[in-house]
A protein has these predicted regions:
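Structural alpha/beta core scaffold segments of enzyme domains
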Residues: 1-184
Length: 184
């Protein structure tokens, strides 16, 4: 980007708390290089306000989820979860000039790694291309997929005429997860 040898460049990276996905973006680096080149020989400090950061950031991907399930008494015997969103990995890699060769696992994050044990369980993720830049906001796919998943569990509890917490506990065989839900 600069045309300079790496030995002529010094970068002092600030330690920060949660970057929430923002550290994966390179636009701030390009801006810092432009400012440094315009002020040759002068050390620079580039800081974005929270408002500037949010203005220049990529969006969280829009998503859609659909669940089909089968109840047998108070147990879920089949859970078929489909989710679609744009690919964060594809969008971020594209901004760096790369393409991803296959599926983006972030689309199904939070959909399959659940403590519930169903006799029949399927998760399908669909990449839905959009023309809007998307980025890895905190938890990427788990945000929307956990919402879709848990909302479906609530709806199934309602159909089973069961208390949502008790219904969940009947579906979970992981002791640590049961302990967390029981403690709340």
């Amino acid at each position: 980007l600069t045309g300079l040898p790496t030995s002529a460049i010094t970068v002092n990276t600030m330690l920060m708390g949660g970057g929430f996905g923002r550290r994966a973006e390179m636009d701030v680096i390009k801006q810092a290089i432009s400012v440094a080149q315009a002020m040759e020989g002068t050390p620079i400090l580039l800081t974005w306000s929270r408002e500037e950061d949010m203005t220049h950031d990529a969006y969280r991907p829009a998503a859609m989820g659909r669940v089909r399930a089968k109840l047998e008494g108070d147990r879920i015997s089949a859970f078929d979860f489909a989710t679609a969103s744009s690919s964060v990995v594809e969008s971020q890699a594209g901004r760096l000039g790369y393409a991803i060769p296959g599926p983006d696992g972030a689309i199904v994050q939070g959909a399959w790694e659940q403590p519930y044990r169903f006799a029949n369980h399927r998760v399908t993720g669909y990449r839905a291309p959009v023309m809007v830049p998307v980025g890895s906001w905190r938890s990427v796919g788990a945000s929307q997929n956990a919402f879709f998943h848990e909302t479906a569990i609530d709806e199934l509890a309602h159909l089973a005429k069961a208390d949502p917490l008790e219904f969940r506990l009947r579906q979970i065989d992981d002791d640590a997860s049961r302990a967390v839900l029981s403690a709340v």
